[in-house]
Design a protein with these regions (language model features):
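Membrane-interface alpha helices of multi-pass inner-membrane proteins
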Residues: 121-122, 126, 165-179, 189-191, ...
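Transmembrane-helix signature of polytopic, membrane-embedded enzymes
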Residues: 15, 89, 103-127, 145-146, ...
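Short helix- or helix-capping micro-motifs
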Residues: 22-28, 118-129, 133, 146, ...
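Lumenal/periplasmic acceptor-binding loop at the mouth of the active site in multi-pass
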Residues: 250-329
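Loop-to-helix entry region of an early transmembrane alpha helix in multi-pass inner-membrane enzymes
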Residues: 70, 74, 82-100, 134, ...
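Extracytoplasmic catalytic/substrate-binding loops of multi-pass membrane glycan-assembly enzymes
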Residues: 35-48, 57-58, 63-78, 84-88, ...
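Transmembrane-helix motifs of polytopic, lipid-linked glycan transferases
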Residues: 92-112, 150, 326-333
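Juxtamembrane membrane-water interface segments immediately following transmembrane helices
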Residues: 32-59, 203-259, 263
Length: 401
């Protein structure tokens, strides 16, 4: 893998341009991080990491937790050893990871789609405003996206070179554990790349290697089967906040002071079931609204909708990538002769991932921009049929290398 990257650096002018752009952006972002400085935004993952660093275990304020899967808090635990400055150190590491993600998206795209589209895809990824900023946030998306891209590159590279498939399998399952909503999508991609009969045992064993230790820990700690993370009823509850009674809200806020997240699931469940049974039409309507939030802008940011930051980071990317996705779907349906069967199946899987993730958030909650960012880069890859479908762009796109 390293030699493959170095070989392309030596031989490909386009790859070097992306690399130098990445180095420039990395330098600017690190100067801003440590020079201005930009204060990193941290949520629960960081506080779990602090407890790990302090030797008190995988905990939050109310004791043991399964609110977050272990990959990202463990990633943060080493920076957490150096106190609050560790936030800056962790952000610096994340900026390096996103620099390498830009290189890997070029490499994977060049294998699958050709080097010229790879140049465009990696350029759009590197300059995507939300992705430029997001490594300043200590939240699992900052690790999920680089891991997902690394998995894709390793899967493409191992298929091209007929290499050992276990490492990309492990990275794929690790990505799914980092962001469990991606598990069905990762499974679909694992089967796409490694679905032959001879790989079935390896797929199962590598999944067990990644998920079993965490599942055993949760069984021993909570006496419950939790292979990923605890919040299920909580996510439904958060999406129903506008409809629950004030008494129910007060009860939940009180319970949160002394219950851990696994215990709280029992408190959320009857509230959610009551909403389903008494206000199902309202729930359906709000689910449709959350779907539009996912694909446009969450309600909590509506009062900032026309500020330059939101226009540049969300409105324009969502609009342009949304139009691109619509056109690409039309081309996949109507211009199948421009795509190989393998590429067609790959792109359909990506569309399926986008649809699945948007439906899950629509059914639960879609209050944060970051929910979309785990998968928004897939829309960049889905621009390929546009390049392939129009004669001039197809000529620019070039051939596979």
């Amino acid at each position: 893998m390293i030699f493959d990257v170095l070989k392309d650096w030596k031989e490909s002018k386009q790859f070097r341009l992306i690399g130098w752009l990445g180095i420039l952006l990395l330098t600017i972002k690190l100067v801003m991080l440590f020079g201005i400085p930009i204060i990193p935004h941290a949520i629960e993952d960081w506080y779990i990491a602090k407890h790990i660093a302090e030797g008190s275990g995988y905990n939050l304020s109310n004791g043991s937790t399964a609110l977050k899967t272990p990959v990202y808090p463990l990633f943060l635990s080493l920076p957490a050893f150096i106190g609050d400055f560790g936030k800056f150190f962790a952000c610096g590491l994340q900026h390096f990871l996103w620099f390498f993600a830009t290189l890997f998206i070029y490499k994977a795209s060049s294998i699958r789609f050709g080097s010229r589209f790879a140049f465009v895809a990696s350029l759009l990824f590197a300059l995507h405003p939300a992705y430029v900023y997001y490594p300043y946030v200590l939240e699992s998306t900052a690790l999920t996206v680089p891991l997902f891209i690394l998995f894709w590159y390793l899967a493409e590279y191992s298929k091209l070179e007929s290499l050992n498939t276990k490492i990309p399998m492990l990275i794929g399952w690790l990505t799914a554990l980092t962001q469990p909503i991606l598990l069905p999508g990762i499974l679909a991609l694992q089967l796409f790349y490694f679905g032959k009969k001879r790989n079935v045992i390896s797929l199962i064993l590598t999944a067990l290697v990644i998920f079993t230790p965490w599942t055993i820990r949760n069984a021993m700690t909570f006496d419950a089967f939790i292979p990923t993370k605890s919040p299920m009823w909580m996510n439904f509850y958060e999406g129903m906040q506008k409809d629950v009674t004030s008494q129910e809200q007060t009860h939940i806020e009180s319970a949160r002071r002394y219950m851990n997240d696994v215990e709280l699931e029992k408190e959320y469940k009857p509230i959610v079931i009551r909403q389903f049974s008494e206000k199902f039409t309202t729930y359906v309507n709000r689910s449709f609204h959350r779907f539009t939030e996912f694909w446009s802008l969450p309600d909590r940011y509506r009062n900032q909708m026309w500020t330059p930051a939101i226009i540049v980071s969300r409105i324009l990317p969502q609009l342009l990538l949304g139009i691109g996705l619509f056109l690409s779907i039309l081309m996949i349906i109507n211009m199948s002769n421009h795509l190989s069967i393998d590429d067609r199946h790959f792109l359909i899987i990506l569309i399926g991932i986008l649809i699945y993730v948007s439906i899950i958030y629509s059914l639960t909650q879609a209050a944060n921009i970051r929910f979309k960012l785990d998968v928004e880069w897939l829309q960049i890859l889905l621009l390929f049929p546009i390049f392939q479908g129009f004669p001039k762009l197809a000529g620019f796109q070039g051939t596979r290398e």
